[in-house]
Every structure is written in structure tokens, then in C-alpha cells.
Amino acid sequence: ATYWPEIQRICDKYGILLVLDEVITGFGRTGNMFAATTFGIKPHIITIAKGLSSGYQPIGGSIIHDEVFNVVAEGGELYHGYTYSGHPVAAAVALENLRIIQEEGVVEHVRDVAHPYLAEKWHALADHPMVGETKLVGLMGSIALTPNKATRAKFASEAGTVGYKVRERCFANNIIMRHVGDRMIIAPPLVIKPAEIDILMERAKKSLDEAYKIVKDEGLFVAG
């Protein structure tokens, strides 16, 4: 809660532009339209992409603060462009996607329904013998895998070895969780319903249990 405001303070102090990559976090993922709002900061530039069209069409862009835009505008015409700028189909899909997000209350659903329901169940995974930490912001969560819950030590095996085994059990149980090293990541659909969250958590717990047995049987449940 204090990290990003401190980054903002340092950038402001030294006149550094603050640029946020919101390709993943933009358009409701964190329970607000942008993560900048979630973390209480005001960036100069926000980069956006797949959330703008919910991934249905390739599109990207930047949201620029007046402080930056005015400098560029005063410099005259900017002779730069992209081959696929202003693609009409992608632009139309993005506009329709934004309409749906606003009119159907997708961001509010994440903030008021999906996140609170998921949070209690997600953080309960901290009781699993192979989980050292759980985190969840909006509908973006992670669990840190560890062989020692007390110290949250790393595994002795190469980073990602255990995470990969958990991922494989997830795939086998029809749930998508990516592994970044030995940390598991989820980012369910913004429109996920409580009943679907129940299914997600049932499969996540089953996958962790199965992977835990495999890791122990293969002698990998050892701290580095």
C-alpha cells in the first residue's frame, strides 16, 4: 500500500516521469478501471493494450497526462506512426468492449462481488503445506510455493522446477495457472461468478495436493 506512493514521491521530487505499464492491470483487473487508482498514484503515462479489447482484437495505446502532451504538442507535428495505427476493426471492437465494461458494471463486479468472494477462499490456501504466502489484488492473485512455511525458504531444486509440476497438475485438472519460478499466478475472467470461483478453488486445491505428493515422492520437498 505504501510502495507505489513512495515511488511517486521520489519521481516527483527529482522531476522523473512516472510511466505505468497497465497492459495487464488496466480496465478492471485490480477492481478499479486502472491500477493507478487502486494504488493511489497519478502517472504521467499509462500504457494499455489487451484489456482495451478484452483480447478480442490486437490493439494498444498510451494515455498521456496534459503535462507531457502539451510539451509534445508545442513541438509541432510529430512525424512518427505505425503500420497498423487506427485499424478500424480493432478500434470498433475496443469501443464496444468499453461500452460493455461500463454499461454492464464489469469493474464494479470485480470490486464488489468477485474479489471479496475469491479473497477469502484464495487466502485460505495459505494453510496448504506447500504454500508460504498468498496475494490477491482484484482478480490477480499469486501463491508462493515453499518447502518450509515458517521461513518461506526456496526449494533446493532449480527455480521453477516445483512450480512447473504444480502447473502441470493444474492443466490436468482443467485450470489455467501459470508459474513464474515457484510462484503460481491466476487471473480469472473479470465476469467470473461465485459458483465458478468455487470450481476454480476446488481444482486449485486438488492440483496443489497432487503436486505436493509428487514433489515429496521425487525428493524435491527440500529447502535450498
What are these language model-derived features?
Residues 1-224:
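Conserved N-terminal phosphate-binding loop of PLP-dependent enzymes in the Aspartate aminotransferase
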